[in-house]
Amino acid sequence: MHEWAIAEGVVEALLERGRKEGARRITRFTLTLGEIQGVEEELLRLALRELSRGTPLEGAEIKVERERGRVGCRGCGFEWSPEVGSEEEEALHFLPDLLPLFLRCPRCGSVDLEIKGGRGIWVSSLELEK
């Protein structure tokens, strides 16, 4: 359950930012999740709520946005957002070098591909109360 570890990092980063800004409370934040990251949103929300108890983050509104996965072809430069199934998504999360096993460039047929977007997790907005 890597959602708990992710939530710990997010809570720690948000609390640190709140301290630096002199905030009494963090009222709202938006997390952007890459769709290839393989994060279960409801588990992440649960972990965030639990880890926020008794902190300036408790009760904050949590908004989650998804970033579509994007793949780029090193051969012709074409970029697209492929449709991948859950098995492929999980494999790509842990071993992105397996991308050529699942996809070919729809323009030139190359397997020389790279993930250009849809990986990672970041706080994309934050509202504080001072």
Model features per residue range: what roles?
Residues 1-28, 36-52, 56-130:
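N-terminal, polar/charged subdomain of small-to-medium soluble alpha/beta proteins
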